[in-house]
Regions:
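Conserved alpha/beta core of the MobA/IspD/sugar-nucleotide pyrophosphorylase nucleotidyltransferase superfamily
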Residues: 140-147
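Flexible glycine/serine/alanine-rich "lid" or loop that lines and gates the nucleotide-sugar donor pocket
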Residues: 137
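Acceptor/aglycone-binding surface of glycosyltransferases and processive sugar-polymer synthases
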Residues: 4, 12-34, 39-42, 51-129, ...
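Carbohydrate-interacting regions of secretory-pathway proteins
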Residues: 1
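A short, conserved beta-strand element in the Rossmann-like catalytic core
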Residues: 48
Length: 171
């Protein structure tokens, strides 16, 4: 396993895994609960999120001060199909009209957030879609950072039109 081989030269690296696939929200929560740092940064594993933007997200969070719980990436130059971009645009408009949290793109996996703020959020599946609104509800501010989207390098999306729409509505 690649992670195990890296641990020999990186003693700080830990390998945490679930016994079975549990979904994005559960994976992030497990990682955050095991994190030792005060700030946690996330990105999707399909290659669309460029890790080069993590320092900018961290800086934005740090400069905004302790009352800011989340620096949320917002994709520019999306590399998805026109249909997928249309779905996201509609979903984000509906979501934004209801939640009024000022976030135009909750689907971006690039985020930096205060561990303490994240752990104060109520946990539910699909939490990652609502992090900005939940941070605001808990009294934190949210800052947004434009990040450049890249074409997907690996895997396939687990989110389609119907499950994205219905899960979002029910949540």
């Amino acid at each position: 396993d690649a992670i195990e081989s890296l641990r020999a030269s990186r003693p700080w690296l830990r390998h945490i895994r679930h016994d079975r696939s549990t979904g994005q929200s559960a994976a992030v929560r497990t990682g955050v609960r095991h994190a030792r740092a005060d700030v946690v940064c996330t990105l999707d594993g399909d290659g669309q999120n460029d890790p080069a933007f993590i320092p900018a997200l961290y800086r934005a969070l740090d400069e905004a001060g302790a009352t800011t719980g989340l620096a949320q990436g917002q994709r520019v130059g999306r590399k998805d199909t026109a249909f997928k971009k249309l779905q996201s645009r509609i979903a984000n408009k509906v979501r934004g009209a209801i939640l009024k949290d000022g976030t135009r793109d909750t689907g971006c996996g690039l985020k930096c957030f205060r561990r303490e703020a994240y752990l104060a959020l109520p946990y539910f599946d699909a939490l990652h879609r609502f992090m900005p609104a939940l941070m605001v509800r808990e009294g934190y501010r949210v800052v947004h950072v434009d990040v450049v989207d890249r074409p997907r390098l690996t895997g396939t999306s687990n989110y389609g039109f119907l499950n994205r729409a219905f899960v979002g509505i029910f949540d």
